[in-house]
């Protein structure tokens, strides 16, 4: 076996500590990027359906615009997530879910993360400007809400952090819509409304599952500050608002209405059942079911919106 001297060993250790491609991807929070790009695409398809009866042909004819829209949006979102990781370094190490991030372990220093975040965000904004200024403006609005209002301010100070932060998650369908027509149709705002109202029950259920982690990090999530009973009532209230909100797109047809009525009705039923649960572990189990159903609801809604628009 070849000998390894001290200098060689130091180099090997130093190289092993260098950030990998996976580390860069981790900081971009690709799960968030993918989910938001799905809604960007949905907004694009919905807007296209108002311009032509052959949406598939339109998508092909405008494939470059769609590409710049998706790429620009993805970079804006990824850059914002980099900035979120940079800002949250001081609390992420306290949470099991986030303590392994390169921003926490030291594999990437803060200055590099900050520079990359700003650079990626700027690049995405330029690409959206190539599409049109309205899409770019909404991209920046979403980034500002997520990075400044949510991450730097409300996440650390108030239980409404999830609600206000939801504005950033509701902006992507408007970006997609604006990429087709800068003059926004009322449906663009309804898509925004549905996405905005969907997020509180989704993230509050997640917060219930991760209550002790948030408590350890000093993040004032609703279940940490006010307990499970109030959080469950809030979840049910938001779902009750979501149900009629989703039906505002009644002109999408009977199939859309049936799908959303059944999904929303069942989710509300699940929520109401949870109000009767008093034992903590059972409440956490209920929260897990609510969280995963929220993902199913989101997926089914997007698929339905796209299919009825084609």
From Swiss-Prot:
GO terms for cellular component: plasma membrane. InterPro entries: Protohaem_IX_farnesylTrfase, UbiA_prenyltransferase, UbiA_prenylTrfase_CS, UbiA_sf. HAMAP family: CyoE_CtaB (MF_00154). Keywords: Cell membrane, Heme biosynthesis, Membrane, Transferase, Transmembrane, Transmembrane helix. It is an enzyme of class 2 (transferase). One of its GO terms (molecular function) is protoheme IX farnesyltransferase activity. Belongs to the UbiA prenyltransferase family. Protoheme IX farnesyltransferase subfamily. This is Protoheme IX farnesyltransferase. NCBIfam families: cyoE_ctaB. Pathway: Porphyrin-containing compound metabolism; heme O biosynthesis; heme O from protoheme: step 1/1. It is a multi-pass membrane protein. Interacts with CtaA. Converts heme B (protoheme IX) to heme O by substitution of the vinyl group on carbon 2 of heme B porphyrin ring with a hydroxyethyl farnesyl side group. Carbon 2 of the heme B porphyrin ring is defined according to the Fischer nomenclature. PROSITE patterns: UBIA.
């Amino acid at each position: 076996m070849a000998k390894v001297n001290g200098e060689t060993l130091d180099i090997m250790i130093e190289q092993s500590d260098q950030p990998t491609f996976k580390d860069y991807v981790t900081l971009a929070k690709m799960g968030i990027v993918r989910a938001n790009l799905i809604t960007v695409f949905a907004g694009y398809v919905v807007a296209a359906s108002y311009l032509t009866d052959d949406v598939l042909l339109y998508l092909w004819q405008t494939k470059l615009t769609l590409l710049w829209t998706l790429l620009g949006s993805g970079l804006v979102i990824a850059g914002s997530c980099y900035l979120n990781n940079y800002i949250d370094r001081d609390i992420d190490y306290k949470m099991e879910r986030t303590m392994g991030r390169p921003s926490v372990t030291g594999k990437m220093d803060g200055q590099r993360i900050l520079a990359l975040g700003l650079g990626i965000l700027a690049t995405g904004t330029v690409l959206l400007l190539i599409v049109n200024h309205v899409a770019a403006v909404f991209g920046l609005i979403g980034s500002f809400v997520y990075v400044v209002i949510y991450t730097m301010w409300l996440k650390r100070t108030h239980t409404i952090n999830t609600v206000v932060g939801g504005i950033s998650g509701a902006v992507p369908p408007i970006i997609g819509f604006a990429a087709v027509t800068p003059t926004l149709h009322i449906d663009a705002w309804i898509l925004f409304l549905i996405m905005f109202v969907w997020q509180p029950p989704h993230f509050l259920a997640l917060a219930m599952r991760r209550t002790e982690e948030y408590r350890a990090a000093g993040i004032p999530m609703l279940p940490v500050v006010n307990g499970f009973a109030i959080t469950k009532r809030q979840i049910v209230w938001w779902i009750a608002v979501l149900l009629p909100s989703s039906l505002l797109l009644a002109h999408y047809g009977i199939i859309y209405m049936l799908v959303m009525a059944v999904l929303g009705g069942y989710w509300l039923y699940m929520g109401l059942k949870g109000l009767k649960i008093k034992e903590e572990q059972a409440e956490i189990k209920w929260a897990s079911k609510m969280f995963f159903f929220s993902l199913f609801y989101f997926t089914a809604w997007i698929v339905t919106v796209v299919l009825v628009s084609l």
